[in-house]
């Protein structure tokens, strides 16, 4: 598979041939479920001029159906381009194909989609991760040069780690959320999934920057990262020792070897600890579900998508539309979010979760005061088998090392470093100070080149 960097040098005719080739390949690999099948019936080669980039099903592309992999939004056609898509097109890229995802980005396996599950291209019995599992599977499976996803608590980095590609979540506000179907507004961030770190930098440079259409967009000077990429920069890296030690033995051993390589290549390694991850999980699922219960209240059968036909009055329209339209996991999170925001529990849960979030952010800032980057696992295990997570809590624990990065609003990247005995990918996660993506990408490029050599 050619890289984004190589494809940007293609002529218009070469790009058209590439798109036709990718389209045919995607149709042959329908079993993988990386793309939403109904979308493959369209001629994706006419998606516009530019290098093709696959798009997660919660990012608006004008004229495309946007469903967030939910029955309740089927039939909704986006009337405008998301700001990230506007920037994408302005920089020589074109949207190409709708990637499958967990419904409303709520999940870690891409098994809750109303279109059916996505498989892991490394092993069809394993999950691709989520919620951007389709985006990761498309890139890792050779069906896309790169893709856009969204990351609320690890939804770009975790599937990238499970499928064996690079997953990069910029700092909160660095990429506009205008045109992204909201799950949790204070945590959501559009990210990129690519074949390598340089491509991640190229795609990030194309979509990042301040946007007046998004009130949470960071009005901070944005300097392109690609011209300044430097894999030879020597960095001070804080290894989160308690997280590395708590990971599965194969993941732990791979990360320890990676740390030794970083030392051997001249990076300064120091050892730090973060809070017990149970605080991250509690704070994240209270805040995220509270915001989701508010954001998803707009899907009631009045303005968007499907409306139940089995109705006699207004109340039945609301109840039946939402009962029929939302999947089990989405209903679970809406109920939890409504509960923690209720008058009797707001102080006991939501306010305490926000205090915990501030504490988590302060701990990261303390470590990053005298370190350039943080190093830790992306996931505690490699990709798990379908239907082995017996409870929602087991599924939630898959994001244990990624959610705190969103709570703190920092940038994070997942880089493949090893394979386990079954050939499944193991990745390392690097984390930077807010809006210091240049250092993050420099460190990731250094790590990637070390692994290749």
From Swiss-Prot:
A GO term for molecular function: ATP binding
Active site: 56, 131, 155
A matching Pfam family: Amidase
Catalyzed reactions: L-glutamyl-tRNA(Gln) + L-glutamine + ATP + H2O = L-glutaminyl-tRNA(Gln) + L-glutamate + ADP + phosphate + H(+)
Keywords noted in UniProt: ATP-binding, Ligase, Nucleotide-binding, Protein biosynthesis
Coiled coil: none
GO biological process assignments: translation
Top EC group: ligase
InterPro entries: Amidase, Amidase_CS, Amidase_dom, AS_sf, GatA
CC annotations in GO: glutamyl-tRNA(Gln) amidotransferase complex
E.C. number: 6.3.5.7
Superkingdom: Bacteria
Subunit structure: Heterotrimer of A, B and C subunits.
Function recorded in the entry: Allows the formation of correctly charged Gln-tRNA(Gln) through the transamidation of misacylated Glu-tRNA(Gln) in organisms which lack glutaminyl-tRNA synthetase. The reaction takes place in the presence of glutamine and ATP through an activated gamma-phospho-Glu-tRNA(Gln).
NCBIfam families recorded: gatA
Family: Belongs to the amidase family. GatA subfamily.
Name the UniProt record assigns to this protein: Glutamyl-tRNA(Gln) amidotransferase subunit A
């Amino acid at each position: 598979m050619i890289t984004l960097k190589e494809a940007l040098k293609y002529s218009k005719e070469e790009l058209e041939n590439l798109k036709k080739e990718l389209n045919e390949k995607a149709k042959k690999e329908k079993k993988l479920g990386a793309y939403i099948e109904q979308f493959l019936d369209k001629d994706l080669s006419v998606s516009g001029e530019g290098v093709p980039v696959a798009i997660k099903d919660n990012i608006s592309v004008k004229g495309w159906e946007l469903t967030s992999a939910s029955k309740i939004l089927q039939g909704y056609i986006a009337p405008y381009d998301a700001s990230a898509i506007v920037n994408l097109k302005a920089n020589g890229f074109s949207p190409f194909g709708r990637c499958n995802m967990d419904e409303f980005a709520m999940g870690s396996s891409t098994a809750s989609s109303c279109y059916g599950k996505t498989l892991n291209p490394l092993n069809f019995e394993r999950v691709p991760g989520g919620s951007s599992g389709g985006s990761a599977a498309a890139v890792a499976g050779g069906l896309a040069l790169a893709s856009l996803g969204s990351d609320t608590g690890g939804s770009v980095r975790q599937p990238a780690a499970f499928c064996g590609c690079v997953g990069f979540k910029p700092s909160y506000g660095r990429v506009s959320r205008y045109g992204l179907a909201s799950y949790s507004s204070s945590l959501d961030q559009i990210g990129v999934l690519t074949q390598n770190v340089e491509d991640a930098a190229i795609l990030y440079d194309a979509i990042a920057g301040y946007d007046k259409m998004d009130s949470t967009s960071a009005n901070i000077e944005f300097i392109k990262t690609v011209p300044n990429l430097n894999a030879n920069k020597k960095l001070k890296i804080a290894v989160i020792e308690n997280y590395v030690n708590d990971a599965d033995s194969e993941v732990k051993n791979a990360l320890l070897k990676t740390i030794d390589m970083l030392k051997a290549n001249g990076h300064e390694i120091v050892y730090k600890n973060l809070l017990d991850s149970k605080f991250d999980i509690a704070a994240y699922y209270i805040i995220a579900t509270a915001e989701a219960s508010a954001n998803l209240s707009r899907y009631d059968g009045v303005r968007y998508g499907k409306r139940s036909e089995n109705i006699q009055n207004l109340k039945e329209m609301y109840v039946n539309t939402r009962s029929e339209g939302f999947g089990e996991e989405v209903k679970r999170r809406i109920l939890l979010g409504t509960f923690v925001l209720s008058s009797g529990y707001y102080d006991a849960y939501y306010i305490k979760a926000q205090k915990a979030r501030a504490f988590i952010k302060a701990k990261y800032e303390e470590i990053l005061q005298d370190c350039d980057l943080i190093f830790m696992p992306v996931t505690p295990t490699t990709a798990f088998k379908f239907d082995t997570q017996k409870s929602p809590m087991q599924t939630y624990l898959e994001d244990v090392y990624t959610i705190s990065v969103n709570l703190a609003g920092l940038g994070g990247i997942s880089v493949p470093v090893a394979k386990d005995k079954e050939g499944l990918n193991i990745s390392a996660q690097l984390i930077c100070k807010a809006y210091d993506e240049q250092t993050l990408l420099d460190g990731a490029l250094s790590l990637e080149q070390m692994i290749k050599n």
